[in-house]
Swiss-Prot record:
GO molecular function, a single term: rRNA (guanine-N7-)-methyltransferase activity
The protein's name in its UniProt record: Ribosomal RNA small subunit methyltransferase G
Gene (name only): rsmG
Signal peptide: none
Source species: Bacteroides fragilis (strain YCH46)
Any one Gene Ontology cellular component term annotated for this protein: cytosol
PANTHER family listed in its UniProt record: S-ADENOSYL-L-METHIONINE-DEPENDENT METHYLTRANSFERASES SUPERFAMILY PROTEIN (PTHR31760:SF0)
Pfam family, one: GidB
Amino acid sequence: MNTTEQTSSLPSAGGENGVKLLLKYFPDLTEEQRKQFAALYELYIDWNSKINVISRKDIENLYEHHVLHSLGIARIIRFRAGSSVMDLGTGGGFPGIPLAILFPDTKFHLVDSIGKKVRVATEVANAIGLKNVTFRHARAEEEKQTFDFVVSRAVMPLADLIKIIRKNISPKQQNALPNGLICLKGGELEHEAMPFKHKTSMHNLNEDFDEEFFQTKKVVYVTI
């Protein structure tokens, strides 16, 4: 199935329901974005049956626990056109793929050390016609390019992550928010963030999203 067929085909019930959830919080999605988000359901169901990138117990929560969670980053920043973002430890494409759909004029570079996960993310992005994403199978330490922001979802402790990605943050500023690291994390984070408290801010996603899943979820931003 080519990209045009994939994005224009009728969405599954799972995809339709997922898009309804997203529209609750992002009502301005274009028709193309809605089609792309809807297509994710069948694609991840199919790929997850071959390569486990999402817990099989959690795949039915794809839109709430993975897609909407990824879009939580958009609650603290709207990336300007031409911005560049690296998703470190992307796994099956989170948060990079949902963000790339939401911000089609921003360039996203998705990196993971596990090749089969990179394959899934690449195939999903190709199937929905994303043109603003690139992929690399590599360890974080091997990536030398610079970006406006690095995003990540609970990959490792903040101190370790900051040490690794400091080299990847561009000194050139083009967004309202200074360049840095944006992480999706959960639970008690004050101790973890303490060494960087003067450069760190936390946004509670339960202020934006009603679902119980988000009660302890945060977006952590660190200026680099």
